[in-house]
Amino acid sequence: MMINIPRGTQDILPAETAKWRYVESKLHNIAANYNYKEIRTPMFESTDLFARGVGGSTDIVQKEMYTFKDKGDRSLTLRPEGTAAVVRSYIENKMNGDANQPVKLYYNGPMFRYERKQKGRYRQFVQFGVEAIGSENPAIDAEVIHMVYNIYKSFGLKHIKIVLNSIGDMDSREEYKQALIEHFEPHINNFCNDCKNRLHTNPMRILDCKVDHEQPTVKTAPKITEYLNDYSKNYYEEVKQYLDLLNIPYIEDASLVRGLDYYTHTAFEVMSEAEGFGAITTLCGGGRYNGLLEMLDGPKETGIGFALSIERLLLAIEAEDIQLDVEESVDIFVVTMPETVKEAVKIVAELRNAGIRCDMDYLGRKMKGQMKQADRIHATYTVVLGSNEIETNKIQIKAMQTGESETIKLQDIASYIKGE
């Protein structure tokens, strides 16, 4: 029986990997423009990292993690998100002692969640994210949101919106939590079992429940902005002032709460409004986390970051019918005769060593078939290598797009292609 790909995963084939490389390269360059440095963490971590860092009451920890025991009977989990692992690395490697504060990091790699498969959502997916750790300053919150805005604009996306909210500090959230309990408790029997279980542990999760988000009592629930203390209000106002200064458009939504327990103060999402994008409109989410490092037994440092889905970014680009300049061509295809194959192998190797992208026939095709192959792989030039060309040390190089040919020396192929 044929073995198929696991459910909820995908093969990214050569026709698509060019787009992925283009997108990821641009993301790396944008992060570098903001002085963020790349960090790479393991794809699996101690399960306790996510239970404590992400939050035991979240859907991720309760339902979506891929957890297993290793041969040493240790509980390990394939990472479902990037922030907790980056913060763990920051603490473990004592980056808070670095004079270059805040520490600005970015990551790019696969994450794993056991979710129901649908368009734009996979069980293995790729996230690009940034974390700025060591500064509690509204200006760096604005910097992170500015980077997000520039990322989507750099791909030519027009139908996006930034949704912004503050979920306050821990004191504000505690007061808000009590207000939510009082609001939902008389109606809790109308809610799903998850919401019932979360009423007294984390009632904010009820607000973004995937089952009950249309409940009337959810829509009439008190807003976090009504419970912000003076510090939280002032912090939020300063963030908005910086965003206005940077001409970044945003929409305030007091019902926005992020699905992870570690968020405080600034919370934001980027949504696609493009027709045909699909039911899942969130492209990116992020926010500030002022207590996460202490929750993981780290120093009293604060951070802010975001994570975006590469898959959903590509879907948004497709939905807006944006063509990426990613056509990959071969510089030259060497057409061979049976008697010149060995010489062609040598010439092709020399061209590759000179930095020329080239290929040749390995199936013994006739000349016509080789020319068709050159066309299929979008070769810029072709040369036909026969015994006469080897004897005279001269060859005709043909531009495939125009059909024009020019006679040059064999040893000059590389410099001709480079325009030297």
Curated annotation (Swiss-Prot):
The keyword Cytoplasm applies. Its EC number is 6.1.1.21. SUPFAM superfamilies: Class II aaRS ABD-related, Class II aaRS and biotin synthetases. It comes from the Bacteria. The keyword Ligase applies. It is found in: Cytoplasm. GO terms for molecular function: ATP binding; catalytic activity, acting on a protein; histidine-tRNA ligase activity; transferase activity. Keywords: Aminoacyl-tRNA synthetase, ATP-binding, Cytoplasm, Ligase, Nucleotide-binding, Protein biosynthesis. It catalyses: tRNA(His) + L-histidine + ATP = L-histidyl-tRNA(His) + AMP + diphosphate + H(+). It is an enzyme of class 6 (ligase). GO terms for biological process: histidyl-tRNA aminoacylation. CDD domains: HisRS-like_core, HisRS_anticodon. One of its GO terms (cellular component) is cytoplasm. It holds the Pfam family HGTP_anticodon. Homodimer. Belongs to the class-II aminoacyl-tRNA synthetase family. This is Histidine--tRNA ligase. It comes from Macrococcus caseolyticus (strain JCSC5402) (Macrococcoides caseolyticum).
